[in-house]
Regions:
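Glycosyltransferase specificity loop/lid
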Residues: 1-220, 224-479
Length: 479
């Protein structure tokens, strides 16, 4: 490609929380004159439809999904797997190495760079073999990735292999975070020295660290100390914070309603229900595209929502093929009738961006996934945290301890909350003594985030700097 239009291969990891922000970032790259090819497997192609309809110049590379004994036939996205499906999916996608190399070898004008998800570290080896650059796209924040990279590079071990509460300290990371072992990344906790699958995972993370640069969906004012730390840790300044990366047409109901799948309630009906509610009177409850509550967790959550007296929207994911369907995702039979009028239940996908931006929303009870975190902050909505795994415990600490826009509600993927305590927190989140303070702090972060992506803002400049870098590197590689 020419100097003004570098060609980049985008490779998203097939999970909604990973795909959607990278696809939104891809839209921004196209708007800045970058030529794009996106790599997906057949069943993930529909996720590209909104992007392709807006940007018909984007090319697609559709490669067959490799078979794997732990992934049911027909499943190509981790939304259809239980939480432990991440490891199998990461290993399985590594089988695409040779088909990708073949495609590059046969392309008349191949890409000069690969931008791939943080879980696809094997693409660094592909880029090195081809003599091009690989950039990590991180759908997690800088604090969380600092912890993850420290784990995989340093490989700390428990003193007592049976003590799940043993603290892991990270003294070199700003604010010296520490986490009990059970809160550490489950992918890291599953590591077995010499095991081919988990050794492959470790190699992927080390390849991330060795890649040419990292693009973060975060903003400087939210994670400045961690972004600075990572530049020192990596030994270079090729770290760009371009967030919050917003979806095109973020206020368009038709665009947002099916952005991540189908819903049991139309977006227009959800918004009409919210229109009938008072300002700052509704708690939105959602635990992301991956987590499915156990029936006992769901029972206690339902009791808490009932006892709290607050208006609410509950977005509840159903059990996937890998769950024991009788033990997960079942909403109590009494619940919906008892809370009719005061509560709205949405099964599977909910138009979260539209919900959070509505004037009626007072608080968000969340698993603290990074996309949910950013979507709440961009809407100026305080949070109730219930981290369950992955990067979520680090994100909760950032929200509660550092920015004071959240309060802790529960912790752990298997933890069953106390319904009385949770009911009190839900009520406090709507009309408690410190609600206004949290709302003001959240509103301040909202203004900072919005100004950052406007022309002249920090994230706007970071995006421009990254595109300039891609052009310069493409010129060098082509020469």
């Amino acid at each position: 490609m020419s100097e003004n239009h570098p060609h980049v291969l985008i490779f998203p990891y097939p999970a909604q929380g990973h795909m959607l922000p990278l696809l939104d970032f891809t839209h921004q790259l196209v708007n800045n004159g970058v030529h794009i090819t996106i790599l997906v497997t057949p069943k993930n192609l529909p996720f590209l439809n909104p992007l392709l309809s807006r940007n018909p110049s984007i090319k697609t590379l559709v490669l067959p999904f490799p078979s794997h004994p732990s992934i049911p036939a027909g499943v190509e996205n981790v939304k259809d797997l239980p939480a432990n499906g991440f490891l199998s999916m990461m290993c399985n996608l590594g089988k695409l190495r040779d088909p990708i190399l073949d495609w590059f070898g046969n392309h008349p004008s191949p890409p000069s760079a690969i931008i791939s998800d943080m879980f696809l570290g094997f693409t660094h080896e592909i880029a090195t073999q081809l003599g091009i650059r690989r950039y990590v796209f991180s759908p997690s924040g800088a604090l969380a990735l600092s912890v993850v990279y420290s784990l995989w590079r340093e490989m700390p071990k428990r003193k007592d292999p049976n003590d799940e509460n043993e603290n892991f300290h990270f003294p070199n990371i700003p604010n010296s975070p520490k986490f009990p072992f059970w809160q550490i990344s489950p992918i890291y906790r599953s590591y077995v020295e010499g095991d081919p699958s988990t050794e492959f995972i470790r190699e992927c993370y080390l390849a991330d660290i060795a890649s040419h640069g990292i693009v973060f969906n975060t903003f400087i004012e939210l994670e400045n100390v961690y972004l600075d730390y990572l530049m020192k840790y990596l030994g270079h300044n090729r770290v760009w914070s371009v967030g919050p990366v917003l979806p095109p047409g973020e206020d368009d109901v038709s665009v947002q309603s099916n952005r991540g799948g189908s819903s049991s309630v139309l977006a227009s009906e959800i918004l009409a229900w919210l229109d009938r509610c008072e300002d700052h009177s509704v708690v939105y409850v959602c635990f992301g595209s991956q987590a499915v509550l156990t029936n006992k967790q769901m029972e206690e959550l339902a009791i808490a929502l009932d006892k709290s007296g607050v208006h609410f929207i509950l977005s509840a994911k159903r059990a996937t093929k890998g769950h024991a369907s009788n033990d997960y995702g079942v909403i109590p039979s009494w619940f919906e009738e008892k809370v009719a009028g005061r509560g709205l239940v949405v099964r599977d996908w909910a138009p979260q961006v539209l919900i959070l931006k509505h004037r009626a929303i007072a608080a968000f009870l969340t698993h603290c996934g990074w996309n949910s975190t950013l979507e709440s902050l961009i809407a100026g909505v305080p949070l109730l945290t219930w981290p369950m795994g992955a990067d979520q415990f680090a994100n909760a600490n950032l929200l509660v301890d550092e920015h004071e826009v959240a309060i802790r509600a529960c912790e752990g993927a298997q933890t069953v909350p106390n319904s009385d305590e949770l009911a009190a927190l839900l009520a406090e989140a709507v009309q408690g003594n410190k609600v206004e303070e949290r709302r003001l702090r959240a509103s301040k972060l909202r203004k900072i985030a919005i100004n950052g992506i406007k022309e002249g803002g920090n994230s706007f400049k970071e995006l421009a700097a990254f595109v300039k870098h891609l052009r310069e590197e493409a010129t060098i590689i082509e020469a």
